[in-house]
Amino acid sequence: GCCGAFACRFGCTPCC
């Protein structure tokens, strides 16, 4: 899974 602010910054969506 891709969760966390760092994940969002890496273009991982949707963000948890």
UniProtKB/Swiss-Prot annotation:
<dbReference type="GO" id="GO:0090729">
    <property type="term" value="F:toxin activity"/>
</dbReference>
<dbReference type="GO" id="GO:0005576">
    <property type="term" value="C:extracellular region"/>
</dbReference>
<protein>
    <recommendedName>
        <fullName>Conotoxin tx3d</fullName>
    </recommendedName>
</protein>
<comment type="similarity">
    <text>Belongs to the conotoxin M superfamily.</text>
</comment>
<feature type="disulfide bond">
    <location>
        <begin position="3"/>
        <end position="12"/>
    </location>
</feature>
<keyword id="KW-0800">Toxin</keyword>
<feature type="disulfide bond">
    <location>
        <begin position="8"/>
        <end position="15"/>
    </location>
</feature>
<keyword id="KW-1015">Disulfide bond</keyword>
<feature type="disulfide bond">
    <location>
        <begin position="2"/>
        <end position="16"/>
    </location>
</feature>
<keyword id="KW-0964">Secreted</keyword>
